[in-house]
Amino acid sequence: MEGISNFKTPSKLSEKKKSVLCSTPTINIPASPFMQKLGFGTGVNVYLMKRSPRGLSHSPWAVKKINPICNDHYRSVYQKRLMDEAKILKSLHHPNIVGYRAFTEANDGSLCLAMEYGGEKSLNDLIEERYKASQDPFPAAIILKVALNMARGLKYLHQEKKLLHGDIKSSNVVIKGDFETIKICDVGVSLPLDENMTVTDPEACYIGTEPWKPKEAVEENGVITDKADIFAFGLTLWEMMTLSIPHINLSNDDDDEDKTFDESDFDDEAYYAALGTRPPINMEELDESYQKVIELFSVCTNEDPKDRPSAAHIVEALETDV
C-alpha cells in the first residue's frame, strides 16, 4: 500500500474513479445533512439512506462518505481507500458480509459508497450500551452465535476470495435486531493472500487497529497471514465477555467502581508491552456456560500464529453447537 506522501489531491476525476463510477447507474444520494448519521470511522462518516420513491418500499442503504472536515492531504488518502473498498466489496457475496450496492457521487459532489444496511448498530455500540448500563457480559450463547457468523464470513474471505480483512474488531461487525443477522463490514484495508494464506505483496501494509493487532503486526518484519484476522477475532469475543477495549484498563483500583478515567493513570509503557498478547479475563465473573467461549478465545489469541485455528476450523467446531 502506498504511503500518504504519494497521494496528491486530484485536480479532476481520475481514470480509476471513472472506471468504478461508470459501472454504477445514476443514483440520487442526498447531501449529508438530509440523512441520519449511523456512525463514523477513520476519515469517514456512515449515514442511513431511506429509499421509498413514489410510495414504494425499498430496503434502506448505509452510505459511507468522506468526512468533510478532512484536509486535502488526507482526503485523497481516504478517497483511494474508499475506492479500494468499493472495488473489493463489489466482488464479495456472502450472508455474513455487508453487501455492495453502489459507488457514486452525492448531490454535494462527494464520493459515496452505498452498502447493504446490515443493522441498526455495530457490535461495539451494543457493548458500550451494556457497559454503561452496568450489565453483565453477553450470554455465552450470543457470543458463540456471533463467533460462528463472523467465522463464516472470514472463512469466505480467506479461502474463497484470498483476502485478509485486516481490521477485525467489534465496530466492524453490524447487528440487526436481536442478533437476527451478523455481518462483517469495512473491507477498505483488506490485503491479498497467496496460496499459503500469507501476505507477500511488498507494497501491502497491514493497517489494523492498535489494540486488536497480533504480535506479528506489532513486531518489525512480522509475517502477516490469515491468522492475523483470527487473533483480532479472538479479541472481539473478549470484548463481549469483558465489555472493554483490549489492553485498556480504565481503572487500576478494582475496589473503586465509581472512579472515572484519568489520562494521567494510563500506563503507556504497559499498554505497548501488552499489544499482541492475550488480555486477562476475570474468571469469577463468568460461569461454566462460558467454557467453550473462553477456550475459543484462548486458542485464537495464541501469540504464535501457527497455534491459532483457521476460520474454517472454527466454523467446523462451532456449527455442531450453535
Curated annotation (Swiss-Prot):
* Short name of any one Pfam family annotated for the protein: Pkinase
Question: Phosphothreonine modification sites?
Answer: 9, 24
Q: What is its EC number?
A: 2.7.12.2
Keywords (A to Z) from UniProt: Acetylation, ATP-binding, Isopeptide bond, Kinase, Nucleotide-binding, Phosphoprotein, Serine/threonine-protein kinase, Transferase, Ubl conjugation
Catalytic reaction annotation: L-seryl-[protein] + ATP = O-phospho-L-seryl-[protein] + ADP + H(+); L-threonyl-[protein] + ATP = O-phospho-L-threonyl-[protein] + ADP + H(+); L-tyrosyl-[protein] + ATP = O-phospho-L-tyrosyl-[protein] + ADP + H(+)
Activity regulation information from UniProt? Activated by phosphorylation.
Which named protein is this? Lymphokine-activated killer T-cell-originated protein kinase
Which positions bear N-acetylmethionine?
A: 1
Q: How is it modified after translation?
A: Phosphorylated; in a cell-cycle dependent manner at mitosis.
- Gene name tied to this protein: PBK
| Subunit structure of this chain's protein | Interacts with DLG1 and TP53.
Protein kinase domain ranges (all copies):
32-322
